[in-house]
């Protein structure tokens, strides 16, 4: 299983409604990509423990965790037209992002 992990910070000028719409579009589009086995979207939780949150160099408000079967499925997903369309939306709605892929087997 490969986890495609994306941390993202929406653009500061987006309203809450625009943020919600962009996230809903990402979620609904993911349902139509056959390689995706699991799609999870979450908002960052802060807890106030001294030193922990302050150690983070960059704030990312949301995380996407997308699971696919293997590296071949990941490549198909990343090269698919649906991913390119999502990338366009993603680029227009985010101020900062990180994406990494991990083998979870």
What are these regions (language model features)?
Residues 1-62, 69-75, 102-105:
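Short S/T/G/P-rich N-terminal loop/turn motif that feeds into the first structured element of a domain
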Residues 65-97:
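C-terminal structural segments of small proteins and small subunits
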């Amino acid at each position: 299983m490969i986890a495609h992990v994306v941390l993202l910070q929406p653009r500061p000028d987006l309203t809450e409604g625009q943020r919600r719409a962009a996230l809903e579009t990402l979620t609904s589009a993911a349902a139509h990509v056959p390689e995706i086995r699991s799609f999870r979207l979450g908002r960052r939780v802060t807890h106030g423990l001294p030193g922990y949150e302050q150690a983070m160099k960059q704030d990312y408000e949301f995380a996407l965790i997308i699971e696919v079967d293997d590296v071949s499925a990941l490549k198909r997903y990343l090269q698919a037209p649906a991913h390119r369309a999502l990338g366009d939306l993603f680029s227009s709605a985010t101020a900062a992002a990180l994406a990494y892929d991990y083998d979870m087997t």
